Amino acid sequence: MKQEVILVLDCGATNVRAIAVNRQGKIVARASTPNASDIAMENNTWHQWSLDAILQRFADCCRQINSELTECHIRGIAVTTFGVDGALVDKQGNLLYPIISWKCPRTAAVMDNIERLISAQRLQAISGVGAFSFNTLYKLVWLKENHPQLLERAHAWLFISSLINHRLTGEFTTDITMAGTSQMLDIQQRDFSPQILQATGIPRRLFPRLVEAGEQIGTLQNSAAAMLGLPVGIPVISAGHDTQFALFGAGAEQNEPVLSSGTWEILMVRSAQVDTSLLSQYAGSTCELDSQAGLYNPGMQWLASGVLEWVRKLFWTAETPWQMLIEEARLIAPGADGVKMQCDLLSCQNAGWQGVTLNTTRGHFYRAALEGLTAQLQRNLQMLEKIGHFKASELLLVGGGSRNTLWNQIKANMLDIPLKVLDDAETTVAGAALFGWYGVGEFNSPEEARAQIHYQFRYFYPQTEPEFIEEV
């Protein structure tokens, strides 16, 4: 009997992947190929995506794992992508203008001047989404100001996940988790905001029906099936924005904050309440819709391992193994003998170290950086608790930064709550697959699907003893 799987098509900024996942959340087959944006013809500093190239990359991935897939019964397909990006399309779904990439600078001026249409504070209070130049709203305002005839001609705006879903099924839809990144929703109403659309002159008719995660969009049509080398008629289930599925796929429960630790640290939580009026007081804050109705994902982000990489380059070399830095810092007592670091290297004039003496070593500088970043995390977690009306009892940690055991212990000690480290990197894919299984009727809820997964965490508990790691 063939093994049953959900096929997740994941379009990331650096890689496009096709991954087959069974009912227990185990990966049965995977393929990956690099993804890259293109330079726009109009301006060589502008970036755009080629939908045809992305679809071809998906086709390449599916063909790489074709022999494994032929041994499987593909119950459903779910598409995940990065947020905000999309395009105007005609009635056939053809692009009227290229997909403007999130890394394109053309929309920065729109963000800087948005106050002439609606106050930035009001915008965040309604939508939850912070002022980031890549927001969908700024793209549509840019198109309205530079290509007004396209907005008039357009049948729809489709986010990038919905562009892919349209090519698979022929259906025009809007993944709710993608709309949640757009800065155009009334986040409390879980629908597009009449106030934001009216103020910016964006017509509501551009946005097709909203679909919840786990809802069936349609079935795989002949042309897409031929391109991907898959059977016709496979149900296509709504997923959407990768962040929301990473939270769910990591095993995060309601009111359990999740820290994704890498070059940047992103702290988010799945909460039933959110005070969006507080968000604009905190730089780097945002709030998106959770993958499940009734929940929100408030969060904040800041530069983290990017600071540590700079410290490494300064006192060691860019190639020095991290373990060497960790061992030197481990020899130094908590508090780094009075050396403190203000770690906001991007926007604070007082960034850098204080309390340096003739006895200070490079290990002190690194330890102070770890402690300074953890103090930043502590402040941000306190803010997030206020915004999301919850009290953290533990912190779930994912991402490359979680491999630094000394930093993990410092976090547990300073936050005074246990840290749960999940080493599985495929949280987005796991989350999307779980909603896929729910969407094809295999389980009564995404949580029931998630209960089939055996999560393995490493725990770090607050302690006053020298750093000691307990592994569970």
From Swiss-Prot:
<dbReference type="InterPro" id="IPR018484">
    <property type="entry name" value="FGGY_N"/>
</dbReference>
<dbReference type="InterPro" id="IPR043129">
    <property type="entry name" value="ATPase_NBD"/>
</dbReference>
<keyword id="KW-0294">Fucose metabolism</keyword>
<dbReference type="InterPro" id="IPR018485">
    <property type="entry name" value="FGGY_C"/>
</dbReference>
<comment type="function">
    <text>Catalyzes the phosphorylation of L-fuculose.</text>
</comment>
<keyword id="KW-0067">ATP-binding</keyword>
<keyword id="KW-0418">Kinase</keyword>
<dbReference type="InterPro" id="IPR000577">
    <property type="entry name" value="Carb_kinase_FGGY"/>
</dbReference>
<dbReference type="Pfam" id="PF02782">
    <property type="entry name" value="FGGY_C"/>
</dbReference>
<dbReference type="InterPro" id="IPR018483">
    <property type="entry name" value="Carb_kinase_FGGY_CS"/>
</dbReference>
<dbReference type="InterPro" id="IPR013450">
    <property type="entry name" value="Fuculokinase"/>
</dbReference>
<dbReference type="InterPro" id="IPR050406">
    <property type="entry name" value="FGGY_Carb_Kinase"/>
</dbReference>
<protein>
    <recommendedName>
        <fullName>L-fuculokinase</fullName>
        <ecNumber>2.7.1.51</ecNumber>
    </recommendedName>
</protein>
<dbReference type="GO" id="GO:0005524">
    <property type="term" value="F:ATP binding"/>
</dbReference>
<dbReference type="GO" id="GO:0042355">
    <property type="term" value="P:L-fucose catabolic process"/>
</dbReference>
<comment type="similarity">
    <text>Belongs to the FGGY kinase family.</text>
</comment>
<dbReference type="Pfam" id="PF00370">
    <property type="entry name" value="FGGY_N"/>
</dbReference>
<dbReference type="GO" id="GO:0008737">
    <property type="term" value="F:L-fuculokinase activity"/>
</dbReference>
<keyword id="KW-0547">Nucleotide-binding</keyword>
<keyword id="KW-0119">Carbohydrate metabolism</keyword>
<comment type="pathway">
    <text>Carbohydrate degradation; L-fucose degradation; L-lactaldehyde and glycerone phosphate from L-fucose: step 2/3.</text>
</comment>
<keyword id="KW-0808">Transferase</keyword>
